[in-house]
A protein has these predicted regions:
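Basic nucleic-acid-binding interfaces
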Residues: 1-97
């Protein structure tokens, strides 16, 4: 299973995601695909977000102690950090503070 959450994304990306995944809430997409398909979908998200103002996060089932893995792209204050095999979230400082 995988979950993708997008914010400030181009409408064409949201339409493309809706083709592959179920949009259960505005900007929140879920589905159950193979690793290969998941990587293709995430590549589409990364290409669409690019250097724009949007951001996205993907979480998927993985054989880890936590049972999942995740990745981010775009302008996001939350960045994944590996800490002895555990995925944690580091918050970047707010610019100007």
């Amino acid at each position: 299973m995988m979950v993708i959450v997008v914010e400030g994304s181009p409408p064409r990306l949201r339409g493309r995601l809706a083709v592959w995944l179920l949009e259960i809430r505005a900007g929140v997409y879920v589905g159950d695909y193979s690793r290969r398909v998941r990587e293709v979908i995430w590549q589409q998200v990364e290409n669409a977000i690019g250097d724009g103002d949007g951001d996205a996060v993907i979480a998927w089932t993985a054989p880890t102690d936590q049972g999942f893995s995740f990745a981010t792209c775009g302008k996001n204050r939350r960045m994944p950090v590996d800490f002895d095999g555990l995925s944690l979230v580091r918050f970047a400082a707010i610019p100007g503070k």
